[in-house]
């Protein structure tokens, strides 16, 4: 069944499948950006490079050797003021300290992380833009969250055994 205003994507990972429903009505810029990266094959063969138990799993920017992937698209406008919340199972855009710097990296919340929500349109209050939620495969997300991590300078919380996004695809 196709839901109005929803784009469904499938992340095929080395630990199983994660199906995500993107909210193109409340997060149109972010959804379009994510879909462009998927359609270009950008996420294929990337890793979840940051795994913090009881917080987030993050991916979308590193190769298996931890080198950064070259991004083709410009950073996007932060849509964290869209009313969607950083709650368990939601997907949001990672960014730098600059509120409008999100590009390809994303994270899935492992718990309700309401401190990441939008509170004001200031550098400290912008928050992290939620643009969808896991609809199937939260068990896979939890399996990723339980993986052993270590340090890969300058990064911490890197899975000791790489967890790959083998393929990302838009599905209907």
Where are the regions that the model predicts?
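Cyclophilin-like peptidyl-prolyl cis-trans isomerases
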Residues: 1-172
């Amino acid at each position: 069944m196709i839901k109005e205003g929803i784009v469904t994507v499938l992340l095929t990972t080395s630990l199983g499948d994660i199906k995500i429903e993107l909210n193109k009505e409340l997060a149109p810029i972010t959804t379009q950006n994510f879909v462009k990266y998927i359609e270009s094959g950008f996420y294929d063969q990337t890793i979840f490079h940051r795994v913090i138990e009881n917080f987030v799993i993050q991916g979308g920017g590193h190769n298996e050797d931890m080198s950064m992937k070259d991004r083709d698209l410009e950073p996007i406008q932060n849509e964290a003021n869209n009313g969607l919340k950083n709650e368990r199972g939601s997907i949001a855009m990672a960014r730098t300290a600059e509120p409008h710097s999100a590009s390809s990296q994303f994270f899935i919340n492992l718990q309700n992380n309401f401190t990441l929500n939008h509170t004001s349109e200031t550098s400290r209050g912008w928050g992290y833009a939620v643009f969808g939620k896991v609809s199937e495969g939260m068990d896979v997300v939890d399996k990723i969250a339980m993986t052993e991590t270590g340090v890969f300078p300058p990064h911490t919380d890197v899975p000791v055994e790489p967890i790959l996004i083998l393929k990302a695809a838009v599905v209907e």
